[in-house]
Amino acid sequence: MASKLSKDSRPTWPRRAIVTAGMPYGNKNLHFGHVGGVFIPADFYARFLRDRIGRENVLFVSGTDCYGSPIMESYRKLHDEQGYEKHISDYVEANHESQAATLAGYDVEPDFFGGSALEPAVHVHEQMTDEIILRLKEQGVLEKRATKQFFDPVAQQFLNGRQVTGRCPIQGCKSEKAYADECDLGHQFEPEELIAPKSALTGETPELRPVDNIYFDLPSYLDFLKGFTKKLEGNETVRSVVVKTLEEWLNPPQLYIQNKFREAFDAIEGELPPHTVTDPEGNKSSFTVTFPSWRERDDAHEVLGAGGVRFRSGKALVPFRLTGNIAWGVPVTDECGCSGLTCWVWPESLWAPVSFTRTALAADEQAGGTRYAAHNWRDWWCDPEAHVYQFIGQDNIYFYGIAQTAMWEALGWNMQQSTLVANYHVLYMGKKASSSSKTPPPPASELLDHYSAEQLRAHFLSLGLGEKPVSFSPKAYDLRETGKNPDGSPLLARDDKRVIDPVLKEGTLLTGVFNRLARSCFYGVAVKDGDPSTVRTGCIPAGEASTEAAEAAEQAALAFEQAMWRTELHRALGVCDAFLRTANKRWSDASKAAKAVQKDDQAAGDALMHQALVDAFLELRVATVLMHGIVPAGCELICEHFDIAPEAFFSWEHVLNSTDALVESLGEKPGTHRVKELPPRFDFFSY
């Protein structure tokens, strides 16, 4: 902490807060990226907010994304190839239960983890979908469009999104997979732009046939989105990857054409809609054609195709599709202007957290209404005193930052725009994680066979994924050859004692530092037969902490709070690391000095030990509050041995106060609050 922080410059927190975590598809269990890149950070933040602004003022919601073509295609393969006989809803529910169990294994505790197609949220979500689509229609921002959809002439059926594969047409995209109208990096495009389409059902090249769908007029919000994005620049709470990604989508509609097609382009340029041409600069291999709007750009596709000119599209706003014709989806009311349609999974997944909020609030109200401070969902999503924090992966910034932002504005409900806490990819062994690679990453649940939840929570939070992609390289799965065994067989890194496991780095802070400080405090005041020391009262010692300890605790709390406000979670952990190590050293030095004096002067030594324990208890208490969201189980165990109710112990109302003040707030006299006795050789953190 380079400069001293002031209590007068603390951040302002919302009155109420929603925390969401990106929803995993219902066709599989969670992979480590889901847990380490989204759910653990969201859980950390939600736990912090509960302590900071009150448990009743925080709702952490997430759930399984039950609908959509990925689920349909996975279910179809399971049904056709492996004879799975249950309904698709049973398939999704089984995966949902596996996801919930995995999250519980990592001590991730949403207030509500539901499913968009599952009870108790399913009918609330259907109602929410109707309300939003009809409201957008009322606002005049929906449009019925006849667009083209892939049709397999061999299978004689329309193909849903994941039943068509090809290459992404967006300029500069490095996606390995593209589907009917989006790639796996989140780029949106028209089906006719997909390069080399192939049916996943038959392997044949599908045809394009016209279908009617409902679209949200996203391009009309270009100026609004430009202004919104401009305001985010320089905002300390917004990660740079969010602003950078939003800006990429706010360009005019453009096509990129390789120079080798210039002659063919020149031959048909007169047939194109209004446009401008920008010649390539330097050694660039393509020139740029810019259009006034997406309509002119789309009209140009047919002309260019007829002229034999191949092209790639630039990122730009296009109408955002709300509906589709797949059977497994949220039904869309015929009042929208089309009949027999379902909602496309991406838009309905954007308002699914609102549906989950409504479901959780209704359940609490029915049970007596004591858990949450307000039971109207608008008090959480539409009130300027409330705020929404959405933890997502970088690939989903377009949907949450572009499409959702514009739709929320279009609704006219005063929907509060979210803070998007977007993380870069978690790499695996230094490379992008892929289930088809030579060393596929393990499922998140399997990691718990090798590491504790707290080791993994601390490690994932240390990676700093808000700043860059970082590799997750657990030694337990490291198959690199690092030498030879005595019998001449290859020695793998996972079995090599010389290889350090990076996952365990943060765990040593818990076992070697945090654990020692906690043990020292509780054992230090424990009543011990035959020990003449006056500090062994079984109670938290009364008295003011030293200036050094009090200032260190205050500065740590303020720095931690600032880091959390900026959603710099790895820096918040870094504050805890530095504070714990300093506190542990302070205790070590002070207790050694006290013991040395006790040998010759029991009273003087006891006075020094008393002060050392006052300092240590203060620093342990503050560290436990700060670390609560990072390693909740161990911190709650420490709280249990303080023998103070968690709602009082973890509340930030007391974090900057002395320990005497906390004890007095309990209605007790300082020096009389008894701690829970610690059994011999007890560890709060041991792995």
Where is each model-derived feature located?
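A non-catalytic, amphipathic alpha-helix used as a structural packing/dimerization or gating element
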Residues: 44, 90-101, 131, 509, ...
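A broadly conserved sequence feature marking short terminus-proximal activation segments
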Residues: 98-179, 221-222, 226-234
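Active-site-proximal binding-pocket segments
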Residues: 495-496, 521-539, 544-575, 579-599, ...
